[in-house]
Amino acid sequence: MDERELQALVERISLDVFHKPFRHRAVFNDRLRTTGGRYVLSTHHIELNRKYYEQYGEEELIQVIKHELCHYHLYLEGKGYRHRDRDFRELLQKVQAPRFCKPVLLSKTKKEHYYKCTSCRYMYVRRKALDTTRYVCGFCRGKLKKIKREC
């Protein structure tokens, strides 16, 4: 699904479900990691997570769009648009939109760097690489050497 199709889908859902037009932009935001989407108050745009669409499909994306459109329409009407507001919860029930979305499964590879002290043989395991010319062993002040993991 590209940006044009997404915009058309959001406009159609807004008219079919809420009977009100959506007059702003709906875009995919690849920086979203843990949420399905968000409504931006300052611009009134709706940003959606592309990974959420790829993981769960169009049906779940429609649910997220309905949720974000609840924020959108309530804010423009001057009603309570936050999750804790009664107006928001009532509109969610009326349009059968979820209050929270399914969690996005992150496929983050865990890379580790291994260093060994040349003097005391202490093994360091780190997530971030370090410059072995600037750092020394914390126990004996010996030099560190980057090694490959021993299985």
UniProtKB/Swiss-Prot annotation:
Protein name, entry field: Protein SprT-like
Required cofactor names: Zn(2+)
Keywords in alphabetical order: Cytoplasm, Metal-binding, Zinc
Binding site for Zn(2+): 67, 71
GO MF entries: zinc ion binding
Cofactor note: Binds 1 zinc ion.
UniProt similarity note: Belongs to the SprT family.
Biological source species: Anoxybacillus flavithermus (strain DSM 21510 / WK1)
Compartments (UniProt record): Cytoplasm
GO annotation, cellular component aspect: cytoplasm
A Gene Ontology BP annotation from the UniProt entry: response to stress
Active site: 68
Chain ranges of the SprT-like domain: 6-148
Pfam families with a match to the protein in the record: SprT-like
